[in-house]
């Protein structure tokens, strides 16, 4: 088992990377979690992972209650949160209780939000089962729900007690989900580590064929990159914003498309848009733009969206949490892959040109 640490003073926590659930009991002991435990999962993950995970807890001497929520981004809302609260009330929990999120980004986000707000905060553990969650959303403490069609507009920063990654859960994912998760993996390479980006590009076939060694390395490198950013800027006051590369346009597309596209698919489109914006601003060369686009194409992620509604996407971007006054915030590559900067841009023609290019 691989162990990494996210160093945040009194909110520090470990990330464990394994190939099964056999060590999770030891992780609970190390975290000194002694209260009642509740596993939150969704209808998809419940079919494939919950039984094995609950058995691992049982084998380690822990009794776990389980609550299943409907799968899908459309259910990451206050109504589902209310259902979780009602279930927790019935268990008569105290503040020593622990909520454990077994699932992808939706389950992690909503479970973390419930943990942050129930009894003004109870323990929280992330057990991510998708590549997107293992590489990105489970690390860093961002939790929340969507509201009135806007993603993650209600939420908090709330760190887990630990993250437990079983890379073999990825074998149960539909190929589309696995590919969507790779978008966030590519993102980490583009923003901070060109060598890691090249590793991903070279190993796409092995990743999609669930090569265990490659998946473990990717999990380790991803978590290291994200942890290094979060340690310097836990609450997104500056540096952490670079993790939003591809997300300003991506989130807007995701909402306008009514979540018909997966988050990673929208981030893929957003990254292509960000690369083109940097090209139009003469911050990067066309070869670099094509490199990233070709990698995303190789994975099988969308790099164009036929019939994209430029005005709707543009207007939706102004609901972005990172907006500053009337200016939109973009993370753009500077000079090369592996280095980015944050820019505020209010050039409507430029932004619409970028969005329109995604439909060409």
Swiss-Prot record:
UniProt KW ATP-binding keyword: no
Metabolic or biological pathway: Metabolic intermediate biosynthesis; chorismate biosynthesis; chorismate from D-erythrose 4-phosphate and phosphoenolpyruvate: step 2/7
Organism name: Acetivibrio thermocellus (strain ATCC 27405 / DSM 1237 / JCM 9322 / NBRC 103400 / NCIMB 10682 / NRRL B-4536 / VPI 7372) (Clostridium thermocellum)
Cysteines paired by S-S bonds: none
Free-text function comment from the UniProt entry: Catalyzes the conversion of 3-deoxy-D-arabino-heptulosonate 7-phosphate (DAHP) to dehydroquinate (DHQ).
Binding residues for Zn(2+): 184, 247, 263
Chain sites annotated for binding NAD(+): 105-109, 129-130, 142, 151, 169-172
Pfam families linked to this entry: DHQ_synthase (PF01761), DHQS_C (PF24621)
Protein name (Swiss-Prot/TrEMBL): 3-dehydroquinate synthase
Swiss-Prot/TrEMBL keywords: Amino-acid biosynthesis, Aromatic amino acid biosynthesis, Cobalt, Cytoplasm, Lyase, Metal-binding, NAD, Nucleotide-binding, Zinc
Co-factor: note: Binds 1 divalent metal cation per subunit. Can use either Co(2+) or Zn(2+).
Top-level taxon of the source organism: Bacteria
UniProt key word rRNA-binding: no
Taxonomic lineage of the native organism: Bacteria, Bacillati, Bacillota, Clostridia, Eubacteriales
EC assignment: 4.2.3.4
GO biological process terms held by the UniProt record: amino acid biosynthetic process; aromatic amino acid family biosynthetic process; chorismate biosynthetic process
GO cellular component terms given for this protein: cytoplasm
Reaction(s) catalysed by this chain's protein: 7-phospho-2-dehydro-3-deoxy-D-arabino-heptonate = 3-dehydroquinate + phosphate
């Amino acid at each position: 088992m691989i162990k990494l640490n996210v160093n945040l003073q009194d909110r520090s926590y470990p990330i464990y990377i394994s190939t099964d659930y056999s060590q999770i009991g030891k992780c609970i002991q190390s975290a000194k979690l002694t209260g009642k435990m509740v596993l939150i999962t969704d209808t998809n993950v419940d079919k494939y992972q919950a039984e094995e995970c609950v058995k691992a807890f049982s084998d380690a001497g822990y009794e776990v209650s389980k609550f299943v929520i409907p799968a899908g981004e459309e259910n990451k809302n206050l109504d589902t949160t209310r259902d979780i609260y009602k279930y927790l009330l019935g268990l008569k929990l105290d503040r020593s209780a622990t909520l454990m999120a077994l699932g992808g980004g939706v389950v992690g986000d909503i479970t973390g939000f419930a943990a942050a707000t129930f009894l003004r905060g109870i323990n929280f553990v992330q057990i991510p089962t998708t590549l997107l969650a293992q590489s990105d959303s489970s690390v860093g403490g961002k939790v929340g729900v969507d509201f009135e069609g806007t993603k993650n507009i209600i939420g908090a920063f709330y760190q887990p007690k630990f993250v437990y990654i079983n890379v073999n859960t990825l074998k149960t994912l539909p190929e589309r989900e696995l590919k969507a998760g790779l978008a966030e993996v590519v993102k980490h390479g583009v923003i901070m580590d060109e060598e890691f980006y090249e590793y991903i590009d070279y190993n796409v076939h092995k990743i999609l064929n669930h090569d265990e060694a490659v998946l473990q390395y990717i999990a380790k490198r991803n978590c290291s990159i994200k942890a290094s950013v979060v340690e310097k800027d836990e609450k997104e006051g500056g540096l952490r914003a670079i993790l939003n590369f591809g997300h300003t346009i991506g989130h807007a597309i995701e909402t306008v498309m009514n979540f018909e596209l997966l988050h990673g698919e929208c981030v893929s489109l957003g990254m292509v848009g960000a690369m083109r914006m940097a090209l139009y601003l003469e911050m990067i060369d066309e070869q670099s733009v094509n490199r990233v686009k070709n990698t995303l194409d190789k994975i099988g992620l969308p790099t164009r969206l036929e019939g994209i509604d430029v005005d709707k996407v543009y207007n939706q971007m102004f609901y972005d949490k990172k907006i500053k006054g009337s200016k939109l915030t973009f993370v753009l590559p500077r000079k090369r892959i592996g280095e980015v900067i944050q820019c505020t841009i209010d050039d409507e023609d430029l932004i619409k040109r970028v969005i329109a290019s995604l439909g060409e």
